[in-house]
Amino acid sequence: MIKLSIINGSPKLKNSNSDFFIKELTSNMSSDISIKKFYVREILKDKTLLKGIIESDKLLIASPLYADSFPSVTLKFLEVFGEFLKENNHPQIEVYAMVNCGFFEGKQNKTALNIIEHFCNRNNLTWKFGLGIGGGEFFPNSSKTPETMATNKSLYSSLKSLRESIENNTSKENILLNPDKMSASIYRLSANMGWYISSFNKTHKIPNLRKKIY
């Protein structure tokens, strides 16, 4: 039995994009994988949870991208976890990362993945590889059956590679991806339309979207 701890770095405690990608990754995972899930906000409130994490064989850190890095709560977690690792004996845990961003291009996540790799090197953890998911807002809202959509082929192929690595201990280079069969301009257009749709749903008037607060 392989013990896998999953750290959700989203500031949200539910319905985040990170939640979605974790669910899609683990839904078809082998029964030989024992999974424990943690939220960084909960860990920072109860640091005894860190003991359960270092008892794992593998660790996955899933987080949104905030300006080439991570949310402040995730950065704080890395700081606290790093200190905990220095003070406690731990096995050679293998680490993966899954970072999603609102930008269309998956390459925007490259720096964040490098941060996790450097964290591993500094704290005697084994870095495996990570997924950098562009268009992160698109995938959770794309369909009730997103795995069948042509735009999502790269995502589900990459999730499969990550799943197989966790199950079979294979290694790969970082995978940077974005929606298939979609241009960046179409992505931006659909994202902007989302604001208008949200405005209608909340009975706000469209002109209010263009108002300035200064």
Predicted regions and their residues:
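N-terminal beta1-alpha1-beta2 submodule of the flavodoxin-like/Rossmannoid cofactor-binding fold
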Residues: 1-91, 171-172, 177-180, 197-214
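Amphipathic alpha-helical segments that form well-ordered structural scaffolds
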Residues: 24, 28, 115, 119-122, ...
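Glycine-rich phosphate/pyrophosphate-binding loop and the adjoining helix
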Residues: 29, 131-214
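Low-complexity, flexible helical/coil segments
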Residues: 38-44, 72-76, 93-102, 130-137, ...
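Short, electropositive alpha-helical surface patch
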Residues: 57, 61-62, 117-120, 153
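Well-ordered, non-membrane alpha-helical segments in soluble/globular domains
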Residues: 73-81, 110-114, 152-159
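Amphipathic alpha-helical interaction surfaces
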Residues: 80-83, 126, 165
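Short, glycine-/small-residue-rich phosphate/pyrophosphate-handling segment
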Residues: 94-151
